[in-house]
Amino acid sequence: MATELLCLHRPISLTHKLFRNPLPKVIQATPLTLKLRCSVSTENVSFSETETETRRSANYEPNSWDYDYLLSSDTDESIEVHKDKAKKLEAEVRREINNEKAEFLTLLELIDNVQRLGLGYRFESDIRRALDRFVSSGGFDGVTKTSLHGTALSFRLLRQHGFEVSQEAFSGFKDQNGNFLENLKEDIKAILSLYEASFLALEGENILDEAKVFAISHLKELSEEKIGKELAEQVSHALELPLHRRTQRLEAVWSIEAYRKKEDANQVLLELAILDYNMIQSVYQRDLRETSRWWRRVGLATKLHFARDRLIESFYWAVGVAFEPQYSDCRNSVAKMFSFVTIIDDIYDVYGTLDELELFTDAVERWDVNAINDLPDYMKLCFLALYNTINEIAYDNLKDKGENILPYLTKAWADLCNAFLQEAKWLYNKSTPTFDDYFGNAWKSSSGPLQLIFAYFAVVQNIKKEEIENLQKYHDIISRPSHIFRLCNDLASASAEIARGETANSVSCYMRTKGISEELATESVMNLIDETWKKMNKEKLGGSLFAKPFVETAINLARQSHCTYHNGDAHTSPDELTRKRVLSVITEPILPFER
């Protein structure tokens, strides 16, 4: 009863009034909704008063989304209505990309706009053919002799699409002392292009490292008074996070709004971008309805009051990992797993005793439903929900693709729980591991490997034995995005974790291991992120063991990590900016195009 009274005093009405599209009527919270969100049923889950009093609490923010509202719309009809119009516009854009008479720089800028506006997935083969034509006809050599903007733009696009191009292309823009020419800074468009290209660097490419420093130093000196509002917005946007590290859907909505302000905007391209964005958003809404119904049916959020309920944030994360409309299965699978990860992480980090955590880890390793008999009640619910969900995913894969993936899914979960358990032991022992010991475990506890293994089986149609073997060994395409996931997470959450008494974090471990200040440790972690990106960039240059769709999915996980943790831990404590982003991607369509 005490728990119910405490929760009912919270301003519940806020969760129904904030962070969603405004409606012409006020939606009132029903008593049932209040009870589900704020109380723990003692009929099915029993905790003794002693246990409740001695358990830790992280005081996480409650869920602030209205599932009833999110589930209310029917979007399938709107998708069908716009398909024919989109096909006609797509055909017009395709003709422009395939125009062999177009000047190369004009073609490159068209491709760049297509990708920024979120349309790249529609024109993958066309873009590849255009770039093949550009390279085979000597276009790259010609562009590098004319302008820095053309050189940087073509370099970035070619590397994005797996072409091997040398950093030496930028040597012609340096003086006899090896410094970039000072007069280049007068061309802001060129400096922006150089800045974006520098983030496609590989290990040891010093020219690109120097290019990044040069570009950043000059871009930071610019002011709106000097370059105008439109260009200043582009510079600010780029400096916040480079294009190569941005999530596709957020970049699309930003680029559409920026592009529609241009006087020379390609109106056909703009109309297609808006139409496509809204159509894909309708697919997301359909996916979210399915995932939300599953989450409500599972009911963990209403039973485990100590844990974070982050289904919407998890689905938003999944959109960042696999945005293309055809990957609904991947989005639903990743969203479900991240929702489970969030709750189980709270069991290990906050609520469970060490003995209980060892029992839960053993149950996951055994993957035997009878193991629930050894678990406390709150863990029984969690384990059985996890057990049923993963078995269902494995069954669907066996039915649709003829492959038994259950051993790979359960191993991924066992590895994750063992990583969680190790962190719990450090916490209970109040010990701070060395950075190497910590990080060797922490990139696995990020849940990146688990998410990517589930994503692999959802994205890849023809499952190959060699790929599965490398997945189990946590191939670089699994580990490196997970490294970035962990490092970004740790940068965002270090202060809160230290306040809770958790001593294992990349920053704190680096401070202790190297004997340096928090400021220097933070800088070192940021440098590690940059170096990891250089290693990961190599996967885009062809020759990867894995097919391009999965490589992009894995890299997208790193991008979503930047998005989620760039301004704090937006998964644990979603702020208004995060909620606006979620709405813009999932529920708020872009205003229609007007000629």
Swiss-Prot record:
Keywords: Chloroplast, Lyase, Magnesium, Metal-binding, Plastid, Transit peptide. Its main location: plastid. Signal peptide: none annotated. Mg(2+) 1 binds at D345, D349. One of its GO terms (cellular component) is chloroplast. Its EC number is 4.2.3.27. Its cofactor is Mg(2+); Mn(2+). A motif (DDXXD motif) lies at residues 345-349. InterPro entries: Isoprenoid_synthase_dom_sf, Terpene_cyclase_plant_C1, Terpene_synth_N, Terpene_synth_N_sf, Terpene_synthase-like, Terpene_synthase_metal-bd, Terpenoid_cyclase/PrenylTrfase. Mg(2+) 3 binds at N489, S493, E497. This is Isoprene synthase, chloroplastic.
